Amino acid sequence: MVMADTNETTTDLVPTNQERMFALSQREAVGLSKSGLVPKEFQGNVANCLIAFNLAKRIGADPLMVMQNLDVIHGRPSFRATFLIACLNQCGRFTPLKYRITGEGDEKTCIAVANDIETGEEYEGPPVSMAMAKAEGWSTKSGSKWKTMPDLMLRYRAAAFFARTTAPEVAMG
């Protein structure tokens, strides 16, 4: 009997920690993909669930919470404003977000503001106005909440812009 010459050692046969973690994530993703509580983009789609698991791991969040607050816009994952606000408010870097609203009509503008907890320095996000909402087409889409809840939508958009420009690590890990 001739034994095959191999350079494999027994340690090559033992899965690495990374491989074990991926296998565990994959099993969890399969389970969640079968749930009716996850959004339709994740139902029956293990690959999308794995991407959500990756995002959750990077930002230290629960995978189901990430899935329920993630929208796919033009093929890219984008967190809902309420999720970004929650992440910012609990990250420990800033005071809770506040909003400055000025003007009326198309000139109504909202700026999200927070202070750095360590230094007290104030940070402002980019201004968001009703004129911007119209120019970008946000307020003219069918079923748009910009028509019925403009103040809330201004706050949401201003908060999302603040998160993306001032603290992108909060949502990207």
Predicted regions and their residues:
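Polyanion-binding surfaces on beta-sheet-dominated domains and ring/shell assemblies
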Residues: 2-173
